[in-house]
Amino acid sequence: PPPDRHTLDLDSLAFPDGARTMTNKRCDLPPGSFRAQHKGYEEVHVPALAPPAMDDGEALKKIDDLPEWARPAFKGMATLNRVQSRVCDAALFGTSNLLLCAPTGAGKTNVAMLTILQQVGLHRRPDGSVDGSAFKCVYIAPMKALVAEQTANLAKRLAPYGLTVRELTGDSNLTRAELDAASVVVATPEKWDIVTRRAGGDRA
């Protein structure tokens, strides 16, 4: 049998104030905020949130406390930040999967560096050099511009280990030999999906 039909009164569901609900001029600002009127515009100053207090026993990880071989990747830094310090041991010494959710600017790139160094530590030779052919790390960035930026950043920081970092996007193809020789590949999700689905071939 056909389904029952009902009449829906859309007018009864509309906001009583119409579009004016989207232009509410009232805004409760946090303590310490102020407004200043200028010619042609209004300035609203909202102070930055203070970071929450450190937990008991919580401390920032000093770069000098990292293994000596890991320190060159953090040249110019004195400590890791709070997010990085909390996951440092899991990223640098752990072997389990790691899922990190942190806001923009929280330092996720340095956490990624710690995970790369985990592989560096596993493949150090007795003389201190690194066997870069024994592992491959894939760094996924959402946009081509970020891929180029992170490739340059990682290449500079991993240079002391003799590791090759290559960029892989729709604008930069790699030969199979170049891809095999890279210890770290920085790619967009779309390009890496294409590469991993492709069977064989001389170019990636």
Label for each model-derived stretch:
Residues 1-89, 95-99, 128-129, 134:
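Helicase-associated low-complexity/disordered flanking segments
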Residues 75-204:
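Conserved P-loop/Walker A NTP-binding site and adjacent catalytic elements of P-loop NTPases
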